[in-house]
UniProtKB/Swiss-Prot annotation:
S-adenosyl-L-methionine binds at N455, A460, A461, E462, T463, T480, I481, N482, S483, Q484, T559, T572. Its cofactor is FAD. The modification Phosphoserine is found at S10, S18, S19, S20, S22, S24, S25, S28, S29, S102, S393. The gene is MTHFR. This is Methylenetetrahydrofolate reductase (NADPH).
Length: 655
């Protein structure tokens, strides 16, 4: 361990003046080495080709923008849950009535951008040319490119009234839109178009519709997604007809698991499809029983998909979810396409933005708030690759709005109060909230604490390796918000701590990050003198007054992996400079997400305010990863010192 030298040349802790991460400049130094996972840099069509060449089947999911801000929060949560099953891509529909190209949180553009940037999903944005000028469409495409979207589903769109009216200076057909994309943007976008297995409802004939489809492909479309259908033979005839007229690109069948009588009627009305009589005969008698219809819909979809997959004509399945998850996930599980335990390319959640696809290093502080980290680094032109580098001023943007919908807690205020306490009576009340979050046991009101302001997701699997120790220290006022155990050469396939390619080994230094009182910090600093050559620490208050024994600009790698034929990868670091940016956010969350649940000047609000104003944020790293984790002993020694009579404490300080 390297420490900042004192004036006499010996190592020791260093006090820093008040500072805030927001005061640093935007200049940064970054190193670039080959990425860990080449697949992250593949285009969607390249991913499709690789899977088709290997015979691996895939699935994809369609969603539509919500109508409300809370609906947007719920949809992003659904992206995270359904993204865990391993879709090759998702697509987001274009709703002309919902101002789809705007910056509204319910717009198609923002929802698709969020799926890419904050949920790490390969995403296709629908775009229609109906009632839009050439300039408007070009503007939408430029905006999509800027936001990191690389895939477009080009559609004509539906007329607002009953009759189609040509747009002066616009486009009249999806073919025109595909040509425009290729003329203006070259090969930047992968382009998908729609196919109609029974012909477009407004088409002259099935043959004429196929001719238009071939024109769309010839104009530059890369693949086709079909409208929904209910019988496999419908798709087989369509694919055969496509092949006969020279369409050779992938054709993905659109699958709609029937989930309710009214939703089926509405979808059939919009798509102008005819439901087969045998399906009507089953549904009509049970039309008022949603559970029975959903169960039938699952069985029907599984049977249809099995027939499609068995044909050898289907490389993947595209599901129309209607923003629901239960039926689609059940179908995918029965087909064996849902990934129950996805392998993690890196220890943290990825972004699918093209400029972040070589990113493979992040500070550990945002481990439980990856969307916040992505938001605060969205203006970076380059991202750390290979190592964090020796940067004196990483350009973290300020997090002024804690209620951006993709950063907002998934739980409404009423649920948060039930979890965190409708009334707090003391600091110990807060300690109990942290303890209940770790234990998973209901609190005194009978509610489970499933989240905290610093962690809106389920606890990481590796937390189970330290659960008893974490519970013990949280009950005594060491309020942990981030931690990891030490790991010495576990296989990369390990179900709890594994990440990266097969055949590798992963390593971790023990890490502990927590809030605690001034009294505890004073005792901790006395104890840390015994661990000076082993434990790095950084302690800071809300004003930025901080003490550390880590050299100012030296990041400490706390997670790394060794893989066959590759350089060592170190995806997680403890960086003292970044910690000062993180502390602003970490302290603010006390007030923004917890304190503001209560009335101003109320006892509960004042307790949270007191913790915000007086507690310290601490991080500890045990550098001796091959040995038993010493951080628990550090904390136990601190508690033991706190329990001594004042005279004994003074004698200890004098040693």
């Amino acid at each position: 361990m390297v420490n900042e030298p004192r004036g006499n040349g010996s190592p020791g802790p260093r006090w820093e003046g008040s500072s805030s991460g927001s005061e640093s400049s935007r200049t940064s130094s970054r190193c670039s080495t080959p990425g860990l996972d080449p697949e992250r840099c593949e285009r969607l069509r390249e991913k499709m080709k690789r899977k088709m060449d290997s015979g691996d089947k895939w699935f994809s999911l369609e969603f539509f923008p919500p109508r409300t801000a809370q609906g947007a929060v719920n949809l992003i949560s659904r992206f995270d849950r359904m993204g865990a099953g391993g879709p090759l891509f998702v697509d987001v529909t274009w709703h002309p009535a919902g101002d789809p190209g705007s910056d509204k949180e319910t717009s198609s553009m923002v929802i698709a951008s969020t799926a890419v940037n904050y949920c790490g999903l390969e995403t296709i944005l629908h775009m229609t040319c109906c009632h839009q000028s050439r300039e408007e469409i070009t503007g939408h495409l430029n905006k999509a490119k800027q936001l990191g979207l690389k895939n477009i589903l080009a559609l004509r769109g539906d007329p607002i009234g009953d009759q189609w009216e040509e747009e002066e200076g616009g486009f009249n057909y999806a073919t025109d839109l595909v040509k425009h994309i290729r003329n203006e943007f070259g090969d930047y976008f992968d382009v998908c178009v729609a196919g109609y297995p029974k012909g477009h409802p407004e088409g002259e004939s099935f043959e004429a519709d196929l001719k238009h489809l071939k024109e769309k492909v010839a104009a530059g479309a890369d693949f086709i997604i079909t409208q929904l259908f209910f019988e496999a033979e419908t798709f087989f005839r369509f694919v055969k007809a496509c092949s006969e007229i020279g369409i050779t690109c992938p054709v993905l069948p659109g699958i709609f698991p029937i989930q309710g009588y009214h939703s089926l009627r509405q979808l059939v009305k919009l798509s102008k499809l005819e439901v087969p009589q045998q399906i009507k005969d089953v549904i009509e008698p049970i039309k008022d029983n949603d559970a029975a219809i959903r169960n039938y819909g699952i069985e029907q979809a599984v049977s249809l998909c099995q027939e499609l997959l068995a044909s050898g004509l289907v490389p993947g399945l595209h599901f129309y979810t209607l923003n629901r998850e239960v039926a689609t996930i059940e179908v995918l599980k029965r087909l064996g396409l849902w990934i129950e335990d996805p392998r993690r390319p890196l220890p943290w959640a990825l972004s699918a933005h093209p400029k972040r696809r070589v990113e493979d290093v992040r500070p550990i502080f945002w481990a439980s708030r990856p969307k916040s980290y992505i938001y605060r680094t969205q203006e970076w032109d380059e991202f750390p690759n290979g190592r964090w580098g020796n940067s004196s001023s990483p350009a973290f943007g300020e997090l002024k709005d804690y209620y951006l919908f993709y950063l907002k807690s998934k739980s409404p205020k009423e649920e948060l109060l039930k979890m965190w306490g409708e009334e707090l009576t003391s600091e110990e009340s807060v300690f109990q909230v942290f303890a209940h979050h770790l234990s998973g046991e209901p609190n005194q009101n009978g509610y489970k604490v499933t989240c905290l302001p610093w962690n809106d997701e389920p606890l990481a699997a590796e937390t189970s390796l330290m659960k008893e120790e974490l519970l013990r220290v949280n009950r005594r006022g060491i309020l942990t918000i981030n931690s990891q155990p030490n790991i010495n050469g576990k296989p990369s396939s390990d179900p709890i701590v594994g990440w990266g390619p097969s055949g590798g080994y992963v390593f971790q230094k023990a890490y502990l990050e927590f809030f605690t009182s001034r009294e505890t910090v004073e005792a901790l600093l006395q104890v840390l003198k015994k661990y000076e050559l082993r434990v790095n620490y950084h302690i800071v208050d809300v004003k930025g007054e901080n003490i550390t024994n880590a050299p100012e600009l030296q990041p400490n790698a706390v997670t790394w992996g060794i893989f066959p034929g590759r350089e060592i990868i170190q995806p997680t670091v403890v960086d003292p400079v970044s910690f000062m940016f993180w502390k602003d956010e970490a302290f603010a969350l006390w007030i923004e997400q917890w304190g503001k649940l209560y009335e101003e000047e109320s006892p509960s609000r004042m307790i949270i305010q007191y913790i915000h104003d007086n507690y310290f944020l601490v991080n500890l790293v045990d550098n001796e990863f091959p040995l038993d984790n010493c951080l628990w002993q550090v904390v136990e020694d601190t508690f033991e010192l706190l329990s001594r009579p004042p005279q004994d404490k003074r004698e200890t300080e004098a040693l």
